[in-house]
Each structure stands twice: as structure tokens, then as C-alpha cells.
């Protein structure tokens, strides 16, 4: 993953849930910069906690390389936050070199005192990210049948849970 160049276009940052402005969502988040050499000898990273408004950052491959495949990426972080760069954006850029889109999910982490929903927040966010990618497949030049999910550590648990708790949403609705 070292020495990867950015894709042709800047990544698109979207709120996972409608009615939220992606540019104002980070006001309550805590970002810890992790120096180069701590997790990876060549790359710095960031650990984001207190995520209240999840986002998905869409890294599309160069048009000439695009295969139509996409992967929703769930960074790890022990459900205390997300290692957004090393286990998120760096992986998305690597997927771009293979012709696949990388969609980095910055998901909410459980706060039992606040979460009264039937499904845990991270799972809701992952299911929504997959539905959104499928709903916007034509716009992003993706094949909706070639959208997968992967994760690292807690994000791996989240990815496997999302894969076994499939949620089609409302495919005929304007908002998936």
C-alpha cells in the first residue's frame, strides 16, 4: 500500500443518513493523529472517535481502469472509533489500482446509554452504506451486483455481521 497515488478525482464525502450536511458532521468528533512509524513504518494515520454522524467517502477508480466493482470498507478500532486512514482511505486507494471503487465507512460506535434502536448503530450504518452504493450504482458507474464489504478487526466483525444480516431496504424508494 505504499506510494499509492491519489485517484483521478477527489473522493466524494456523503452523510450516511439523509438530512445531514457532510461538511458539518465532524464538529463533535475527536481525531487523534498517529505518527508515522506507530502503526505503519511509512504512513501516518488518524483514529476518529465520538462519531455521531456517519459518513461514506467514495473513492472511484480512474475511468479507464474501472471494473464496476466496489467495496464498502469498515476500518477497525475496537468499536471505540475508526482507524480511518490505514484501514480505510489507504485501502480504498489500493482498491482503485485494481479497478474497484473503495467506499470508506466512518461508522458510529456503540454507546449503550444512547442507543435504544433494535439494531446496533454500526450495523445500521453498514447496511445503509451498502444500500446507498447500490442505489447510486449508475451514477458512480458501478455494477450493483458487484458491491461487497470488508473490514479490519472490529470493522471485520461489522462487515461479517452486515453480510449475514442483509437488508435490502426499499429498493423502489427514492431513498434506499
PLM feature spans:
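Short beta-strand-to-loop junctions in surface cap/lid or active-site-entrance loops
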Residues: 17-19, 46, 56-67, 138-140
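A fold-wide structural signal in alpha/beta-hydrolase
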Residues: 70, 96-108, 148
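Active-site glycine-rich loops that stabilize anionic/oxyanionic intermediates
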Residues: 20, 75-80, 153
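N-terminal targeting or regulatory segments adjacent to alpha/beta-hydrolase or S9 domains
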Residues: 1-44
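Short beta-strand element of the alpha/beta-hydrolase
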Residues: 67-76
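Catalytic nucleophile-loop/oxyanion-hole region of alpha/beta-hydrolase
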Residues: 82-84, 90-91, 105-144
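Primarily recognizes the serine-hydrolase "nucleophile elbow" in alpha/beta-hydrolase
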Residues: 124, 128-176
Amino acid at each position: 500500500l505504499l506510494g499509492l497515488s491519489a485517484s483521478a478525482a477527489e473522493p466524494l464525502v456523503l452523510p450516511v443518513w439523509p438530512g445531514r450536511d457532510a461538511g458539518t458532521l465532524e464538529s463533535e468528533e475527536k481525531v487523534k493523529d498517529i505518527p508515522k512509524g506507530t502503526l505503519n513504518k511509512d504512513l501516518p494515520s488518524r483514529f476518529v472517535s465520538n462519531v455521531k454522524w456517519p459518513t461514506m467517502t467514495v473513492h472511484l477508480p480512474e475511468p479507464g481502469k474501472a471494473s464496476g466493482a466496489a467495496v464498502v470498507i469498515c476500518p477497525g478500532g475496537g468499536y471505540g472509533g475508526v482507524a480511518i486512514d490505514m484501514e480505510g482511505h489507504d485501502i480504498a486507494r489500493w482498491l482503485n489500482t485494481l479497478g474497484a471503487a473503495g467506499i470508506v465507512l466512518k461508522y458510529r460506535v456503540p454507546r449503550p446509554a444512547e442507543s435504544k434502536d433494535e439494531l446496533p448503530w454500526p450495523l445500521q450504518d453498514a447496511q445503509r452504506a451498502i444500500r446507498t452504493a447500490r442505489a447510486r450504482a449508475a451514477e458512480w458507474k458501478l455494477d450493483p451486483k458487484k458491491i461487497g464489504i470488508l473490514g479490519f478487526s472490529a470493522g471485520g466483525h461489522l462487515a461479517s455481521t452486515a453480510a449475514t444480516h442483509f437488508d435490502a431496504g426499499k429498493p423502489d424508494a427514492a431513498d434506499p
